[in-house]
Amino acid sequence: MRRTPGPLLCELHAHTRWSDGELTVAELVDLHGRSGFDVLCVTDHVVRSDDAWRYEEGARFSSIDETSFPLYLGEVEREADRAWRTYGMLVVPGLELTFNDEEPVLAAHAVAIGLREFVSVDGGIAEAMRTAAEAGAALVAAHPNGNEPATRRGRLTKRFSRDAGLRELAHRFELFNRAQLFGWVAEAGLPAVASGDFHHAHHLRGWKTLLPARHDEEAIVDYLRSPRPVYITRLEDELVRAAA
């Protein structure tokens, strides 16, 4: 079903209207399928029940909870079937385990790829990561800030760069999130990926991961859980148009 040989072009971190993305699951699938992606991971937010950002004035903040998770997973799996038939694109479900805190050194997000059961973050990010890993997910430390400035309010998530114990729970680390580089990840020699953290259509461009793995979910999750090397590429408008 693949249109081109070689490593798989992946978006490992993407959001829909189930949390804070602008597109439905179907729209997300069509955009990435038409643009030549081989793998799309749908990873909407789950936040703790007392998350402070829920109550920001004017904030649009939705997230997955234990009640909505079966509906979310069902929609992603239906769209995964259509994506494979229509585009030869693999769609993998997951969640972004989201532990926000006003103190950046306590805040951390982890993308759980291949997760098919609900995981709460009410017990803390470390417990959530352990639970997701035990369920078979690949865990990617998302936008792991070192000393970089925040690109927008509420985005500083520094705990991975400060907490060696938490780092040990992640299989991979975002070296690039969109166009933002987290240099400490490379300096520490950590297994890296690049993702778009897709919320809006213009996030289709930017740094992405090319994965030298078999084109099925089990192989992709297994590869991401390992320290094996990946390729990183920057996707520009011309390449997106050429792939479509």
Give the positions of each predicted feature.
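An N-terminally biased module of ancient metal coordination in phosphate/nucleic-acid-related enzymes
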Residues: 1-93, 97-98, 126-129, 202
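Short, ordered loop/turn segments at secondary-structure junctions
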Residues: 45-46, 144, 198
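Conserved beta-strand positions in the central sheet of alpha/beta enzyme cores
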Residues: 40-42, 140-141, 174
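Charged catalytic cores and adjacent phosphate/nucleic-acid-binding surfaces used
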Residues: 1-15, 25-30, 101-116, 130, ...
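Hydrophobic beta-strand scaffold residues
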Residues: 91, 139-140, 192
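Internal, conserved structured core segments that host functional sites
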Residues: 107, 133-137, 141-144
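Short helix-loop capping/hinge motifs at secondary-structure junctions, enriched
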Residues: 117-122
